[in-house]
Curated annotation (Swiss-Prot):
Protein known as: Quinoprotein glucose dehydrogenase
Pfam families registered for this protein in UniProt: PQQ
Keyword annotations of the record: Cell inner membrane, Cell membrane, Membrane, Oxidoreductase, PQQ, Signal, Transmembrane, Transmembrane helix
Reaction it catalyzes: a ubiquinone + D-glucose = D-glucono-1,5-lactone + a ubiquinol
Active site, renumbered: D470
Source organism per UniProt: Gluconobacter oxydans (strain 621H)
Keyword Zinc: no
PROSITE patterns: BACTERIAL_PQQ_1, BACTERIAL_PQQ_2
GO MF entries: quinone binding; quinoprotein glucose dehydrogenase activity
Domain of life: Bacteria
């Protein structure tokens, strides 16, 4: 029955709400359809407008029509995304809510509904809810499996001879494996872990700091003492059993807000061997028998006596050297920032540095430099843009090459082969290469293997050709001897990259162990530039199998998803390695990378790896010069204070605007939700003998996702899969540990299956790599919960140790 009598209040409200929703979806949906997106939004919008009209007319046909809408939505969403709870929610949440609203008796009666006329709609809503319920029990992004548990190599080589109970380097050893042979804490008892001690560095951000400040430090441990750097590179020596601070050394960091970021990832350790000599053959000094080498963001390296906290006066100028002078072509504060601990050999410090990304064509060189560990004398250089990369500066060649490719993360070192493996990035500017020379791209990006004594090239492997995406090799490579099918052990190097590919090479020669065939990629660079026709793509990869499409577009509601779909279709996107463009290009994997600086945790006995890849698209838009975007910096111009937003690229035709692919509806409220369906972060287990990803699970919850927004409220701890920034740890106790996720937890995983066995709430973000060690037979797990303000996570100053309770 229909009626044209005056509608009641609830019918008016219903008509108004449906009309508003319908108008938004019709207009937006027409836009989506016009630029190549799905027709569903405009169809739904028109159906809502019709439902609004019928409701206003008090016509019960509104109930029948909306039943068809709900049924149609269920069919559409299951066809497009299947039983994926997070993909279903934005496609059906508003439709279900509106359907339930129409079923409310005080609403349905006012539009002429009866028990009979509401049944089809009730059934449709029930089916939609049932689809959501069923999707709770399946995860199409999940890979289940068991890593092998048998020991493939009971006595893996350790040229550094690190005691099992200690952690001497960033990756425990300079092989970069992030694995410990300790097993007191294991899969059967890890749920009993308790806080053993908790201290504060009291080193927090201040008003003079740059926009990006990160606490990414991984401690080292020996002689029952932890050594680590804080935000402003203060060096702490902490009793590993009690947390008592033994001493603090302050390098008096000289900083200004123009720095791109403030970061210290860790320190290095050198112990004087018996009968040691320096690089000139003179007897090594007797003082500072144990040295801590501290990188400082203003361009210095400082050596400190591990026992006393005093500088080693015989090193450089009273314990420090300046890596910038006298041979850097430009010494603008903040352009050259040592952020990662250097490689240490018996006699040398091999140091690299971060260079400001997308800054200028007039920037410091990324040359690798080796210094005498006792005196600070420079012994060799590797300046990647120089035709002779080992040429030391002299009167005819007083400075390094400007903008030479650099390495900003930790290198690895094989003492037996005497080779140092340097993960290289492209020289800045990063997203445009029209002016690059062959020399400037000869060693970037990729892995450079150098003789540690001389800096002479052993081999080079390029991971990206003519890089226009800032696809540096971002992680310390892992060195492990891997069993081949014929039973032989091959010395391998595993290099995780931002593209999601893990390049597996024979570390003696640089030859591929796992094939990485050259693969055609999208063409068409910006005017004045070019693209490589192919890129190497490793067959060991965590890169998504398929390019992004409409089924991958997400949002909190159907409205957000529609605007994300508009955003998606206005960008250039043709799959991996889509070139940057003036209209804006979608880069996936994005600039943050599937792998970042955390690297892999590799068990050399079981020959398995634990990883925490990221799955977050970015947008890269080249911006032609014009008002507010000058070719060269104006007087008193400052740095960007971060690596997203408008990056100046002074001296080339374009600046570049870089940012994650985020929901444009929520972003004005400071809510940074990606436009790609979650998960945005995983944990994964890899069998290194078969080079297969055996298990992969979404990791992390929504709980802290609102931090930094205008609505900083905690969300329910519902697992969604959030990005993580920091490294994993694995142990012989069949455990993996990770603290780096965007929610504030330390988690322990069964290394065989990836199942979470234990977690504990942290007071701040812990975008760092945890370590483990043992003192007096007691094993500890330690992490630095210091936060990362541009990730963003809450800042802190907390060093926290966990251990099993003492037996009574």
């Amino acid at each position: 029955m229909s009626t044209t009598s005056r509608p009641g209040l609830w019918a008016l409200i219903t008509a108004a709400v449906f009309a508003l929703c319908g108008a938004i979806l019709t207009v937006g949906g027409a836009w989506v359809a016009a630029i190549g997106g799905p027709l569903y939004y405009v169809i739904l919008g028109l159906a809502l407008l019709a439902t609004a009209f019928l409701s206003f007319r008090r016509n019960p046909a509104a109930l029948y029509l909306f039943a068809v809408v709900v049924f149609g939505t269920v069919i559409w969403e299951l066809t497009v995304v299947g039983l994926d709870i997070w993909a279903l929610i934005p496609r059906s949440d508003i439709v279900i809510i509106l359907g339930i609203w129409l079923l409310l008796p005080f609403v349905s009666r006012q539009i002429g509904g009866t028990r009979t006329t509401v049944l089809p709609l009730a059934g449709a809503v029930g089916v939609a809810v049932l689809a959501l319920f069923a999707s709770l029990f399946t995860d199409p992004h999940d890979i289940s499996g068991d890593l092998p548990t048998q020991i493939a190599n009971a006595s893996p080589a350790d040229p550094d001879n690190v005691p099992a109970s200690e952690w001497h380097a960033y990756g425990r050893t300079q092989a970069g494996d992030r694995w410990s042979p300790l097993n007191q804490i294991n899969a059967s008892n890890v749920s009993n872990l308790k806080v053993a001690w908790h201290i504060h560095t009291k080193d927090m951000m201040n008003s003079n700091d740059p926009g990006e400040a990160t606490n990414e430090a991984t401690p080292i441990e020996f002689n029952n003492t932890l050594y680590m750097c804080s935000l402003h590179q203060k060096l702490f020596a902490v009793d590993g059993a009690t947390g008592n601070v033994k001493w603090v050394y302050d390098p008096k960091l000289q900083i200004n807000p123009g720095f791109q970021h403030l970061t210290c990832r860790g320190v290095s350790f050198h112990e004087t061997p018996a009968n040691a000599t320096d690089s000139d053959g003179n007897p090594a000094p007797t003082d500072c028998a144990k040295r801590i080498i501290l990188p400082v963001n203003d361009g210095r390296l400082v050596e400190v006596d591990a026992d006393t906290g005093k500088t080693c006066s015989g090193f450089g100028n009273n314990g420090e050297i300046d890596l910038r002078v006298p041979n850097q072509p430009y010494t603008t504060p903040g352009q050259y920032e040592p952020t990662s601990p250097p490689v240490i050999t018996d006699k040398l410090i091999i140091a690299n540095s971060a260079i400001t990304d997308n800054g200028s064509v007039k920037q410091a060189s990324g040359a690798t430099q080796a210094f005498d560990v006792y005196t600070g004398k420079r012994v060799w250089v590797f300046d990647a843009s120089n035709p002779d990369p080992n040429q030391l500066p002299d009167d005819s060649h007083p400075v390094f090459h400007p903008n030479s490719p650099n390495s900003w993360i930790v290198s690895s070192y094989d003492r037996n082969l005497n080779l140092v493996y340097i993960p290289m990035g492209v020289g800045t500017p990063d997203q445009w290469g029209g002016d690059r020379t062959k020399d400037s791209e000869r060693f970037a990006p990729g892995i450079v293997a150098l003789n540690a004594d001389t800096g002479k090239l052993a081999w080079f492997y390029q991971t990206v050709h003519h890089d226009l995406w800032d696809m540096d090799v971002p992680s310390q490579p892992s060195l492990v001897d891997v069993t081949q099918k014929d039973g032989t052990l091959v010395p391998a190097i595993y290099a995780p990259t931002k593209t999601g590919d893990i390049f597996v090479l024979d570390r003696r020669t640089g030859k591929e162990i796992v094939p990485a065939p050259e693969t055609p990629v999208p063409q068409g660079a910006a005017p004045g530039d070019h693209t490589s026709p192919t890129q190497p793509m490793s067959q060991l990869t965590l890169r998504p199998k398929n390019p992004l499409n409409d089924s991958d577009i997400w949002g909190g509601t159907i409205f957000d998803q529609m605007f994300c779909s508009i955003y998606f279709h206005t960008l250039r996107y043709e799959g991996p390695f889509t070139p940057p463009s003036l209209k804006g290009s979608l880069i996936f994997p994005g600039d943050l990378g599937m792998f970042e600086w955390g690297g892999l945790a590799v068990d050399p006995q079981r020959q398995v790896a634990f990883a925490n890849p990221i799955s977050l698209p970015f947008v890269s838009q080249l911006v032609p010069r014009g008002p507010g975007n000058p070719l060269w910096p104006e007087k008193d111009a400052k740095g960007t204070g971060g690596e997203t937003g408008l990056q100046h690229n002074y001296g080339i035709p374009y600046a570049v605007n870089l940012h994650p692919f985020l929901d444009p509806v929520l972003l004005p409220f400071g809510i940074k939700m990606p436009c790609r369906t979650p998960p945005w972060g995983y944990v994964a287990g890899i069998d290194l003998k078969t080079n297969k990803v055996v298990w992969q699970h979404r990791n992390g919850t929504l709980r802290d996702s609102m931090y930094g927004s205008s609505l900083p409220i905690p969300l329910p701890p519902i697992k969604i899969g959030v990005p993580s920034l920091g490294g994993p740890l694995s142990t012989a106790g069949n455990l993996g540990f990770l603290t780096a996720s965007m929610d504030y937890y330390i988690r322990a995983y069964n290394l065989t299956t990836g199942k979470v066995l234990w977690q504990d709430r942290l007071p701040a973000g812990a975008q760092a790599t945890p370590i483990t060690y043992a003192i007096n037979g007691k094993q500890y797990i330690v992490t630095y919960a210091g936060g990362h303000n541009s990730f963003p996570t809450r800042m802190g100053d907390d060093i926290i140790a966990y251990a099993l309770p003492d037996q009574k």
